[in-house]
């Protein structure tokens, strides 16, 4: 049975009345965005909109992006990545649970020195996935070329952001490569393992 989106009480400043709002809207008021599912076009549009809004509201304050995601669409994830790099607000990324595939890529995309993970988090990197389905050989060839182009791009960005040699990234992403939070710190995907909420 679906749980639905939890609601929490909220009192407008200067008001004596409480109203109930969904938890994600309440977190956004604290400049917290939660990526807690597969990365899809719809989710990416929502996260991009939140990033742009929070940056326009006050670009000197950090935005916290909490990640617990199995990954998902590369193009949707790249929309989030590009927006994170585009805005002026520092983006603090925090992994809790799992950051896999595009989730790990976005974790690594946070502001340098501000990429964090909770102690029991798991991080997994791998190469982009593609499917052939029932299509003509020429279409499969076009898709294969695009997947190889994306793979090269993602590997280069990850090498730049982790400090790892490109050859190591290429080797490690050839198959699913799981890491603990501490291993991800040593690898350069994150900067710190934390047990308490950052101030």
UniProtKB/Swiss-Prot annotation:
Any one GO biological process: protein quality control for misfolded or incompletely synthesized proteins
CDD domains (UniProt xref): S14_ClpP_2
Keywords: Cytoplasm, Hydrolase, Protease, Serine protease
Subcellular localization, as worded in the UniProt entry: Cytoplasm
Pfam families: CLP_protease
Gene Ontology molecular function terms on file: ATP-dependent peptidase activity; ATPase binding; serine-type endopeptidase activity
Catalytic residue list: 101, 126
Enzyme Commission code(s) on record: 3.4.21.92
One cellular component term from this protein's GO annotations in UniProt: cytoplasm
Function statement: Cleaves peptides in various proteins in a process that requires ATP hydrolysis. Has a chymotrypsin-like activity. Plays a major role in the degradation of misfolded proteins.
Quaternary organization: Fourteen ClpP subunits assemble into 2 heptameric rings which stack back to back to give a disk-like structure with a central cavity, resembling the structure of eukaryotic proteasomes.
NCBIfam families noted in UniProt: PRK00277.1, PRK12553.1
PANTHER family in the record: ATP-DEPENDENT CLP PROTEASE PROTEOLYTIC SUBUNIT (PTHR10381:SF70)
This protein's name: ATP-dependent Clp protease proteolytic subunit 3
UniProt source species: Synechococcus elongatus (strain ATCC 33912 / PCC 7942 / FACHB-805)
Gene for this chain: clpP3
């Amino acid at each position: 049975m679906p749980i639905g989106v939890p609601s929490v009480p909220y009192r407008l400043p200067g008001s004596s009345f409480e109203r109930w709002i969904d938890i994600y809207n309440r977190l956004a008021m604290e400049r917290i965005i939660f990526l807690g599912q597969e990365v899809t076009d719809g989710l990416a549009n929502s996260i991009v909109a939140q990033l742009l809004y929070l940056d326009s509201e006050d670009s000197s304050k950090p935005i916290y992006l909490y990640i617990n995601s199995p990954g998902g669409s590369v193009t949707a994830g790249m929309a989030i990545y590009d927006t994170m790099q585009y805005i002026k607000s520092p983006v603090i990324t925090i992994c809790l649970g799992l950051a896999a595939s595009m989730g790990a890529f976005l974790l690594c995309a946070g502001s340098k020195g501000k990429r964090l993970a909770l102690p029991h988090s798991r991080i997994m990197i791998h190469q982009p996935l593609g499917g052939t389905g029932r299509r003509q050989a020429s279409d499969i060839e076009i898709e294969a070329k695009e997947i190889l182009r994306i793979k090269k791009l993602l590997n280069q960005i990850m090498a730049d952001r982790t400090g790892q040699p490109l050859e190591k990234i290429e080797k490690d992403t050839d198959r699913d490569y799981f890491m603990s939070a501490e291993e991800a710190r040593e690898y350069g995907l994150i900067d710190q393992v934390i047990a308490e909420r950052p101030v």
